[in-house]
């Protein structure tokens, strides 16, 4: 018999389907096992390629968000813009911040995928009484009407994605640098 790393250790204890769709519940070896694992190569080749970073909304979309976020090298790129929310990717250089800001009618969710930093939040720009260290896999929730800033304190770029509800930037937004983002706000 040939070595197959995906085959069960004992053929008597295979996972039996819950519903019978006309096939035998016991797989014949090796023909049926080949069919089960045929898609594994397709999945890995899909994940290895670089994604074209552009706005894919409002069409249905699936992405490896971790990989897309780490691939992004712009200050801000809209990845998906719909009617009710928006996903943007951000990359902050060493010592860079997103800038102290407030979204009066927009809730925001941010997730750190790489790097470390500090998030500051508060009811007024002069009183940011909420401060936390953030790092890989940290989630940040910013309620509407809250002043906030994220600062990269690490020695690598801080890579994160942000979800705005409702959308906060125009469809297709790409800001190469923070200066571009500030100019677009004016």
Curated annotation (Swiss-Prot):
CDD domains the record matches: cupin_Bh2720-like
Domain (Cupin type-2) ranges: 89-164
Xref: Pfam families: Cupin_2
Keyword terms of this UniProt record: ATP-binding, Nucleotide-binding
Signal peptide: none
Binding site for ATP: 117-124
Gene Ontology molecular function terms on file: ATP binding
Keyword Cytoplasm: no
InterPro entries from the UniProt entry: Cupin_2, Flavonoid_dioxygenase-like, RmlC-like_jellyroll, RmlC_Cupin_sf
Protein name per UniProt: Uncharacterized protein YrkC
């Amino acid at each position: 018999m040939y070595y197959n790393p995906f085959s069960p250790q004992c053929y008597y204890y295979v996972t039996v389907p819950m519903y019978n769709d006309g096939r035998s519940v016991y797989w014949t070896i090796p023909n049926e096992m080949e069919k089960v694992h045929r898609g594994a190569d397709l999945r890995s080749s899909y994940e290895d390629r670089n994604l074209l970073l552009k706005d894919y909304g409002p069409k249905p979309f699936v992405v490896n968000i971790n990989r897309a976020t780490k691939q992004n090298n712009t200050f801000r790129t809209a990845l998906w813009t719909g009617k009710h929310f928006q996903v943007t990717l951000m990359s902050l250089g060493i010592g860079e911040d997103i800038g102290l800001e407030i979204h009066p009618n927009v809730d925001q969710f941010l997730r750190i995928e790489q790097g470390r930093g500090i998030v500051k939040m508060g009811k007024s720009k002069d009183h940011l009484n909420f401060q936390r260290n953030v790092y890989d896999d940290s989630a940040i929730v910013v309620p509407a009407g809250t002043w906030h800033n994220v600062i990269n304190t690490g020695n690598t770029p801080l890579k994160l994605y942000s979800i705005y509800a409702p959308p906060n930037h125009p469809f297709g937004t790409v800001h190469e640098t923070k200066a571009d983002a500030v100019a677009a706000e004016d």
